[in-house]
């Protein structure tokens, strides 16, 4: 059996044997590489007021497309999103590509005044590859990216 691989994504530095998943439920050791457990598996997607992020002074009165993933590297007893943040991605769940998020964001921009995408509801950086890929497309389309993070 291979030696455990240390996950570099958060301060927990989980030591994962092949096939094991970290405390966040979002990172897995596959053949010695730490990879996302569910790239593109969204737990939630909704158009929210920017103030809900909570950003009271950043483009007040605007809407933003909020997306969230499964898993989180913290165990906050007061978490309002506990049901999604403390679960592993559903293996049979539909995957949403970054281009599909861009299409939804652009449609909401046209019809509802959307300003971009907020990565929220859990710790988005446990899925940093998806955030990176999506944020690049959103930025190129002239919209904003907002990270609601615990770090």
Predicted regions mapped to residue ranges:
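Conserved Radical SAM active-site core
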Residues: 29-151
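Local cysteine-cluster metal-coordination motifs and their immediate loop/turn environment
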Residues: 5-27, 70-82
